[in-house]
Regions:
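N-terminal module-boundary/linker segments of secreted carbohydrate-active enzymes
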Residues: 20-95, 105
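Surface-exposed charge patches in extracellular/virion surface proteins
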Residues: 3, 19-20
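Substrate-binding cleft of extracellular glycoside hydrolase catalytic domains
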Residues: 82-158
Length: 158
């Protein structure tokens, strides 16, 4: 009986010493955790369209002014999705969306943070995102507005 008790106690002790693996974090939880850690640290540097063009060059794969200057990529890279709503193959800065996707994935794999902005065309006038010639644009993309359905379609595409 004593041997059974000692064997049971030994197994219980061994099992209690084993750490349970934590559940894997979702990408959102990982980002929140990283941002929480970084908020008390050094300043993070970001660069819009970093791998697509720089001082005296453009559209050269595997280039980055930041990397060439300091030996590391920016902590944050931003990319614009303007043009996606109209199914263009390139964004409003003429960057192919396929490149944006590729570079966003590469930067995430390096541990970087990616931001996306979206500057759609003006749905009221057809002008660019900075066209403010019509003061009714916002009213017209809201529910019951003339461009509501169009804008909802754009949102679904983006």
């Amino acid at each position: 009986m004593r041997k059974i008790f000692l064997a049971t106690a030994a197994v219980a002790l061994l099992l209690s010493a084993c750490k349970q693996q934590p559940a894997p974090l979702s990408p959102a939880e990982t980002l929140i955790q990283r941002l929480d850690t970084l908020q008390h640290g050094p300043i993070m540097y970001g660069h819009q369209d970093d791998p697509f063009y720089g001082v005296s060059w453009q559209w050269e794969k595997d280039r980055s002014d930041t990397y060439e200057l300091v030996g590391d990529y920016p902590a944050v890279m931003g990319f614009d999705l303007g043009g996606l709503e109209e199914h263009h193959s390139k964004n409003l800065d003429s960057v192919p969306f396929s490149w944006i996707r590729e570079e966003a994935i590469r930067h995430a794999e390096r541990g970087g943070i990616i931001t996306f902005s979206w500057h759609p065309r003006n749905p009221r006038t057809g002008g660019n995102a900075w066209d403010v010639t019509d003061s009714t644009v916002v009213r017209n993309i809201l529910e019951n507005g003339e461009q509501y359905e169009l804008f909802q379609g754009w949102l679904a595409d983006v």
